[in-house]
Amino acid sequence: MALLIITTILWAFSFSFYGEYLAGHVDSYFAVLVRVGLAALVFLPFLRTRGNSLKTVGLYMLVGAMQLGVMYMLSFRAYLYLTVSELLLFTVLTPLYITLIYDIMSKRRLRWGYAFSALLAVIGAGIIRYDQVTDHFWTGLLLVQLSNITFAIGMVGYKRLMETRPMPQHNAFAWFYLGAFLVAVIAWFLLGNAQKMPQTTLQWGILVFLGVVASGIGYFMWNYGATQVDAGTLGIMNNMHVPAGLLVNLAIWHQQPHWPTFITGALVILASLWVHRKWVAPRSSQTADDRRRDCALSE
């Protein structure tokens, strides 16, 4: 849980840094290439093939390609149509995707209690960030929702792989980032604009921060933390970046939030986490234990 909180704080800076200094100034495909390329370099020394099948390695590369490669390309394009606050608002459905996709991948019945606690988190984040949207609303909304879905598929896929095809996390992430990097290379050569390269030391510095710290270290901590909690808690924590991102905007760019809705929304998100951990998760575990006991008795 602590790793998820630390990463949320770290990522709160990423949204604003990219939106303020890179979006519209640096080619989005090049930004993705540098970001995942630097992250891949961080874990390159841990790349191992011994003891792992090609299928397992390929699956870890696939989830990396989805969670980082494709997700970044979609979300970075969305910055061209949305403000930072709008983009934050449109990510609030991610907990629902995470919870439902995990149930689908696990081939289990949909747990509506998990969906309910995730929906509370969605409501809380929506309270914080609901405001007037720009004319490019629909395009931006579509891009962000596709980004949310690919992020959820990658995150849940990684969690499932750790459950069914485990390997040391640092080895897994070497393949994870390699998959994302291959997607970014292909996208850059096919769609990139070489005329929109970083022009200032600040822009290069932000790219290095996003690649090494936010992606390289941040995603390792997030996905490692994801393996330590249930899918419902994971989905709710994913929405904590909304109040965290707003606090960063307040501290650095002095963008004042509407305090009544900010406090109300943050309390709803925290309440959703408390409700989930107090009632929903224990009840789901008890139900699963009862089913296993019934099956054992019937045998």
Curated annotation (Swiss-Prot):
Catalytic activity reported: biotin(in) = biotin(out)
SUPFAM superfamilies given in the database record: Multidrug resistance efflux transporter EmrE
Compartment(s) where it occurs, according to its Swiss-Prot or TrEMBL record: Cell inner membrane
Activity regulation statement: Biotin uptake is weakly inhibited by CCCP and FCCP protonophores and by the respiratory chain blocker NaN(3).
First-listed, main subcellular location of the protein, grouped into a coarse class: membrane
UniProt KW Plastid keyword: no
Region forming the signal peptide: none
Disulfide bonds: none
Coiled-coil ranges (or none): none
Disruption phenotype: Deletion of the gene abolishes biotin uptake. BioH-bioP double mutant is unable to grow on trace levels of biotin.
One GO term describing the cellular component: plasma membrane
Keywords: Cell inner membrane, Cell membrane, Membrane, Repeat, Transmembrane, Transmembrane helix, Transport
Membrane topology field: Multi-pass membrane protein
One Pfam family this sequence matches: EamA
Induction per the UniProt record: Expression is repressed by biotin.
Keyword Phosphoprotein: no
Membrane-spanning ranges: 2-22, 26-46, 56-76, 81-101, 110-130, 137-157, 172-192, 202-222, 233-253, 256-276
EamA domain mapped to chain residues: 3-128, 139-274
Family designation: Belongs to the drug/metabolite transporter (DMT) superfamily. 10 TMS drug/metabolite exporter (DME) (TC 2.A.7.3) family.
The protein's role, per its UniProt record: Uptake of biotin. Acts probably by facilitated diffusion.
Name recorded for this polypeptide: Biotin transporter
Species annotation: Escherichia coli (strain K12)
